[in-house]
């Protein structure tokens, strides 16, 4: 594998949130304590108000990805280069423009959700 795995959610209730950029799923408290393993440039562990800006409780489905480089599902979902962990299949909200600008400054790609 190579890279360190992301934290696995400690509960599966209403406190789950998904990162709007990479779709990593963790609890609010986990995002507050350690941020997003795939999106460290957001620095949400330092700015707790930013958690609400870059994550959402509204998402569809969860997949556990253990070996991203070999997973066909990870390639299909375009999460094959992210840390092993739990990911949502889809988010319906877009990342706010200010956060999209941070992605551009960090030279990382942001793909908005598809309109269904």
Swiss-Prot record:
Signal peptide: none annotated. The keyword Metal-binding applies. Pfam families: Spt4 (PF06093). GO terms for cellular component: nucleus. It is found in: Nucleus. One of its GO terms (biological process) is regulation of DNA-templated transcription. It comes from the Eukaryota. GO terms for molecular function: zinc ion binding. The keyword Signal does not apply. InterPro entries: RPABC4/Spt4 (IPR029040), Spt4 (IPR009287), Spt4/RpoE2_Znf (IPR022800), Spt4_sf (IPR038510). May regulate transcription elongation by RNA polymerase II. May enhance transcriptional pausing at sites proximal to the promoter, which may in turn facilitate the assembly of an elongation competent RNA polymerase II complex. Belongs to the SPT4 family. This is Transcription elongation factor SPT4 homolog 1. It comes from Arabidopsis thaliana. The lineage of its organism: Eukaryota, Viridiplantae, Streptophyta, Embryophyta, Tracheophyta.
